[in-house]
């Protein structure tokens, strides 16, 4: 944006936006709402609201107060019910927000899936994902399914000609997600 445009944008936010919280750490979320909802007169990059959200997510995950649920970290991920990391944010963006910086400004939309979560050392982690993995995690988050049942649901949605092949690939992905800390294990 450049320093002058950035300062002008910040001034209009603090002056015009009716913040809904007095908490200092909530101001970044209010700024995300401002960029997404306000009628801002100055021209802004199309990706700016998503970039602000991506930057806010790191703070949100870092300060989440989520106890870790009971789980068996060595349980079989196809037979058991996978337990997701409670700090996980399974995100989809229209822009490659994780690449935007001083040396890169995207000109075209590029759908991007990212997983953001806090690992066992309380460090915020960012993982580039894909639509199938994002969908698998969404299924696991919304339904009490075994890993196998979730993989079979994906196979059905994709109309995969060989569901068992997809289940085998799904197991590989579930193990990788457990190794990364996205999945903690299975329900006890």
Regions found by a protein language model. Name each.
Residues 75-79:
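Short aromatic-glycine motifs in intrinsically disordered, low-complexity regions
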Residues 1-73, 127-188:
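Long, charge-rich, low-complexity alpha-helical segments
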Residues 81, 86-142:
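Low-complexity, glycine/alanine/valine/leucine- and proline-rich hydrophobic stretches
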